[in-house]
Amino acid sequence: MLTFFAAFLAAPLALAESPYLVRVDAARPLRPLLPFWRSTGFCPPLPHDQADQYDLSWDQQLNLAYIGAVPHSGIEQVRIHWLLDLITARKSPGQGLMYNFTHLDAFLDLLMENQLLPGFELMGSPSGYFTDFDDKQQVFEWKDLVSLLARRYIGRYGLTHVSKWNFETWNEPDHHDFDNVSMTTQGFLNYYDACSEGLRIASPTLKLGGPGDSFHPLPRSPMCWSLLGHCANGTNFFTGEVGVRLDYISLHKKGAGSSIAILEQEMAVVEQVQQLFPEFKDTPIYNDEADPLVGWSLPQPWRADVTYAALVVKVIAQHQNLLFANSSSSMRYVLLSNDNAFLSYHPYPFSQRTLTARFQVNNTHPPHVQLLRKPVLTVMGLMALLDGEQLWAEVSKAGAVLDSNHTVGVLASTHHPEGSAAAWSTTVLIYTSDDTHAHPNHSIPVTLRLRGVPPGLDLVYIVLYLDNQLSSPYSAWQHMGQPVFPSAEQFRRMRMVEDPVAEAPRPFPARGRLTLHRKLPVPSLLLVHVCTRPLKPPGQVSRLRALPLTHGQLILVWSDERVGSKCLWTYEIQFSQKGEEYAPINRRPSTFNLFVFSPDTAVVSGSYRVRALDYWARPGPFSDPVTYLDVPAS
């Protein structure tokens, strides 16, 4: 494959098509680049009163480990439906309503373990107790439940942590998916006031938004528009005051297969909101289900590979380049979430709207589960290298400048760490995407010209690259004949192509200019990361733990929160059978904070330790070791 990649790097420009020119000026920062895209979500299946069986399943525990392992907090939030169905309720004589939070505690602990925040929808009815929010007693009891819940988790995790949570209303109220709860429009407003006051009692720093729905033009979406009217000038159920707080407005606009359609719909909704309710012109806007296509379980080939990854990047770039860069826009856009943390199922391991591909391997004793990292999850790690300030960048073809609604696009950023010019970095991410369409037999010539890079200590750059030939477990699976129960060797081969193809660090050219010529398939992603050498080597890897897969296989997961540097080449993983002499495990360069160890020998019992290596081959300190005792063969 390295020979193939070398040939790819040296490929001459196609004569049949004029090249796309991507110009980036590292000396021209334009505006802050805030990572508004670091969110995902999922919904447990019916029946929702058994949500614990899905949310706390081993499969979901593995899934959340993968999501939490995106480098540099590349995904921070998981937005979950029906959380309150993880609580049970009973009414006892003389004691009133009693709640059991055991399952919800366990699930939130699981998020904490993976350094993830909940997008906390106040959705569900504990043990089916709440049935009617036009019933004033139930409205008061709901306020008490919300207050109890918030105070519980402030006590458990601390106010600093819980104040980061996005509490939100019941999902999509105009879709009337309330299970057995009667929810009129007035009942929904009563419910909202109870959520607001319950949270406020716990702490005024807790934020609440909604309604998390489509906001179709009036007279459609009556609950959406009624909530805005109520928060603007309605009467608070509890205080009698005019108006109720609305800390953010959440809406759902998906793309119907089109990237630009998401932004166009958002802009239309927000324009109508601001016309009808000018008091909300500064209220943060969340699109917390901004998927390119509705229907998470609908199998689509493009959801399986780099097509989906490049499309997600394109949507984000359109928001940054067409919305944040638009000085005439008054929209305060804060969050874009893809609702793609579901678990895929047979016979569609790759092609549903998921971040991982799940294989339920039932031909082992006992049966076990394997997950593979799809490119759409891998690319969130590339996106995490974009931070600091957005740089001036331009795409043109034959002299005509192209906006982000074209096949080739770019996002570029520069990072100036406080107090240490020695750790300056610049990131350029180029995508080729025709939305949901792949063109396997067509490549386009692209020239990158990066200028304005200041001189720095040991200045180097790396190149990372993804396409459907070199970086697609789905393509590998297809070439194997789509086995239902892949063997250990087949899983190893698929995992060989989970990461981008990485071109080793090389010195940045003198005079602060770099020119690269590439032939890029559609879809593909090309990232260039330029760094000066930090004064110190990487910090220590922390939170190392081992999770069992099956006999002779395990997962190692760790945290990069103390590593500090983003100029990382790989993590070195060492193994010792006796816990004395360690030897490195041979693997491809990867900065993903998770590794599946599945050696030919099937010998995995022993001790493990991990350390980061930066672009200058400097190691950080080893993590504390973790010891693993293998699952016995049966």
Swiss-Prot record:
Coiled-coil boundaries: none
Residues spanning the signal sequence: 1-16
Catalytic activity of the protein: Hydrolysis of unsulfated alpha-L-iduronosidic linkages in dermatan sulfate
Gene Ontology CC: extracellular space; lysosomal lumen; lysosome
GO annotation, biological process: adult locomotory behavior; adult walking behavior; bone development; carbohydrate metabolic process; cartilage homeostasis; cell morphogenesis; chemical homeostasis; dermatan sulfate proteoglycan catabolic process
Entry keyword annotation includes Transit peptide: no
EC number: 3.2.1.76
Binding site for alpha-D-mannopyranose: 44, 46, 48, 296
Cystine pairings recorded for this chain: 531-567
Post-translational modification remark: N-glycosylation contributes to substrate binding and is required for full enzymatic activity.
Catalytic residues (positions): 172, 289
GO molecular function ontology, one term from the record: L-iduronidase activity
Subcellular location: Lysosome
Presence of the UniProt keyword Hydrolase in the record: yes
Family per record: Belongs to the glycosyl hydrolase 39 family.
Assembly behavior: Monomer.
UniProt-recorded name of the protein: Alpha-L-iduronidase
Organism: Mus musculus
